[in-house]
Swiss-Prot record:
Domain IF rod residue range list: 54-410
Record-marked site positions (Heptad change of phase): 289, 353
Region of interest (Coil 2), residue spans: 266-408
Name of the protein: Lamin Dm0
Tissues of expression: Constitutively expressed in all tissues (at protein level). Expressed in spermatocytes (at protein level).
Region (Linker 1): 92-103
Head, as annotated region: 2-56
Species classification: Eukaryota, Metazoa, Ecdysozoa, Arthropoda, Hexapoda
GO biological process, one term: heterochromatin organization
Positions of region (Disordered): 1-50, 429-448, 603-622
One GO cellular component term noted in the UniProt record for this chain: nuclear inner membrane
PTM remark: Three forms of lamin have been identified in D.melanogaster, lamin Dm0 is rapidly processed to lamin Dm1 in the cytoplasm, Dm1 is then assembled in the nuclear envelope and is then phosphorylated, forming lamin Dm2.
Prosegment location in residue numbers: 620-622
Length: 622
């Protein structure tokens, strides 16, 4: 019995009893009398003494039992109170956790929606950029075509101008010939007028000579009539004289009559012969004078007629030449007018084309500026969204780490694949290393743990291109396979790049290719120069197309292209860096996460998709 009491007195308290034991509820007990005093003062037997000792021990045991029972009752009361408090706290924590979870899920849904909208906007922007790039290339091709047509039109204009100048020279020559012919015509007209006057004078002289001839003929006729009349008178006088003489002679001696008749006949014959001779002489003189005058008049008339015919022929030929020259001049003037009209039309068309091309270029530049502004704005918005998303992903990662820590502390082992958990943890660690995180305090709240059921990994290769230039010459485009490098002069002045070098490096210290431009190479405003590798089938057409003799551009995933001036200073560069974007998708009963990691040392992104599923599993935080 004594050993039992001793074992009961040394019993340990129940687990969880951390408070100090209170004194028993009974009143203070008197100290037990010592054995020596009892032995000395009471003459009791050893049996009674043992009974008293047992009684005292039982009293002590009863007191300790009462104290223990009271303590147990107090602990039960405290336990019930603490149970109520724990239940109240648990309900409060559950309610707060549910509210925070709902708010967080709403924010996640909103963020997911914003990310989806951003992805759609980015895809739409990329499609629009590609479409606008194609439209820009098409407009550039049209602009090149129009420029070629404009160059052809300018060549035609120059050709037409040269032809117009030739026609103007011919026209001036024709005008000079026309003036000369007009002068010749005026001289011919003057000569014709003089000949006309001479002809008039000749005709007047002819008329006068004709009148003189008529007068002479009339005079001759009058003389003939007068001669005839005189002959008649003479005959009558002779007859009268003969009659008188016969009358007289009839009265004279018949002897002298025959002699006198013979003498008279002889005298009459002589007189008649003399008159006839004189008349013949006069007739011959008049006839000779008349014939000479007529011959002179005929010769003068013939000369006048010949000169008149010659003048008329010359006038006719001159008129024919003048008409032909006038017709030629009219044709040349018409052709010149047509050419001038054509030149004006071509100049107007050229001006319209230049104005239209200028307007198209202005519109394209405005559109490019607007697209650049939109791209800048979208990139800024995308960067803001990415910052927000990264912050949310970091919050999610911190929350997940807290859950993992609580599960590890409480020895809760989720049923998951080890490789998937390691990959997911590695992604979380990479995200924590790569991105500056905002520390989330570890609050002692209840959280739901994610039980991963399945996961999936994807990797996509992408290239990042960045370019910069100090001057007007920039590296516009490079071929990933190393076929060509294209330079572009974005300024409005011609740039001489003779002696400049174009280098292409692999990983800064790897193999490289260097091409040095000829000293006479120049880039026109808005001009493009393409440097081709030697193994391509491009044609060497300087200065726009240059083919290297024996070199070819190096190609790799990470390349850097540099343009050096004659002093060795870098004036333009273009970097092309390969990025591997890995996607990790894991689904669980509570959540579905997707992590996207860009393995180029720049960024690591995490996305969470899907609605969290409800679970009855809880984590008790003491």
């Amino acid at each position: 019995m004594s050993s039992k009491s001793r074992r009961a007195g040394t019993a340990t308290p129940q687990p969880g009893n951390t408070s100090t034991p209170r004194p028993p509820s009974a009143g203070p007990q008197p100290p037990p009398p010592s054995t020596h005093s009892q032995t000395a003062s009471s003459p009791l037997s050893p049996t009674r003494h043992s009974r008293v000792a047992e009684k005292v021990e039982l009293q002590n045991l009863n007191d300790r039992l009462a104290t223990y029972i009271d303590r147990v009752r107090n602990l039960e009361t405290e336990n019930s109170r603490l149970t109520i408090e724990v239940q109240t706290t648990r309900d409060t924590v559950t309610r707060e956790t549910t509210n925070i979870k709902n708010i967080f899920e709403a924010e996640l849904l909103e963020t997911r929606r914003l990310l989806d909208d951003t992805a759609r906007d980015r895809a739409r922007a990329e499609i629009d950029i590609k479409r606008l790039w194609e439209e820009n290339e098409e407009l550039k091709n049209k602009l090149d075509k129009k420029t070629k047509e404009c160059t052809t039109a300018e060549g035609n204009v120059r050709m037409y101008e040269s032809r117009a100048n030739e026609l103007n020279n011919k026209y001036n020559q024709a005008n000079a010939d026309r003036k000369k012919l007009n002068e010749d015509l005026n001289e011919a007209l003057k000569e014709l007028e003089r000949l006309r006057k001479q002809f008039e004078e000749t005709r007047k002289n002819l008329e006068q000579e004709t009148l003189s001839r008529v007068d002479l003929e009339n005079t001759i006729q009058s003389l003939r009539e007068e001669l005839s009349f005189k002959d008649q008178i003479h005959s009558q006088e002779i007859n009268e004289s003969r009659r008188i003489k016969q009358t007289e002679y009839s009265e004279i001696d018949g002897r002298l009559s025959s002699e006198y008749d013979a003498k008279l006949k002889q005298s009459l014959q002589e007189l008649r012969a003399q008159y006839e001779e004189q008349m013949q002489i006069n007739r011959d003189e008049i006839q000779s004078l008349y014939e000479d005058k007529i011959q002179r008049l005929q010769e003068a008339a013939a000369r006048t007629s010949n000169s008149t015919h010659k003048s008329i022929e010359e006038l006719r030929s001159t008129r024919v030449r003048i008409d032909a020259l006038n017709a030629n001049i009219n044709e040349l003037e018409q052709a010149n007018a047509d050419l001038n009209a054509r030149i004006r039309d071509l100049e107007r068309q050229l001006d319209n084309d230049r104005e239209r091309h200028g307007q198209e270029i202005d519109l394209l530049e405005k559109e490019l500026i607007r697209l650049r502004e939109e791209m800048t704005q979208q990139l800024k918005e995308y960067q803001d969204l990415m910052d927000i998303k990264v912050s949310l992903d970091l919050e999610i990662a911190a929350y997940d780490k807290l859950l993992v820590g609580e599960e590890a502390r409480l020895n809760i082992t989720p049923a998951t694949n080890t490789a998937t958990v390691q990959s997911f943890s590695q992604s979380l660690r990479n995200s924590t290393r790569a991105t500056p995180s905002r520390r989330t305090p570890s609050a002692a709240v209840k959280r739901k743990r994610a039980v991963v059921d399945e996961s999936e990994d994807h990797s996509v290769a992408d290239y990042y291109v960045s370019a910069s230039a100090k001057g007007n010459v920039e590296i516009k485009e490079i071929d990933p396979e190393g076929k060509f490098v294209r330079l572009f002069n974005k300024g409005s002045e011609e740039v001489a790049i003779g002696g400049w070098q174009l280098q292409r490096l692999i990983n800064e210290k790897g193999p490289s290719t260097t091409y040095k431009f000829h000293r006479s190479v120049r880039i026109e405003p808005n001009g493009v120069i393409t440097v081709w590798s030697a193994d391509t089938k491009a044609s060497h057409e300087p200065p726009s197309s240059l083919v290297m003799k024996s070199q070819k551009w190096v190609s790799a995933d990470n390349t850097r292209t540099i343009l050096l001036n004659s002093e060795g200073e870098a004036v333009a560069n273009l970097d092309r860096i390969k990025r591997i974007v890995s996607q990790h998708t894991s689904s669980s009963r509570l959540s579905r996460r997707r992590s996207v990691t860009a393995v180029d040392g720049n960024e690591q992104l995490y996305h969470q998709q899907g609605d969290p599923q409800q679970s009855n599993e809880k984590c008790a935080i003491m």
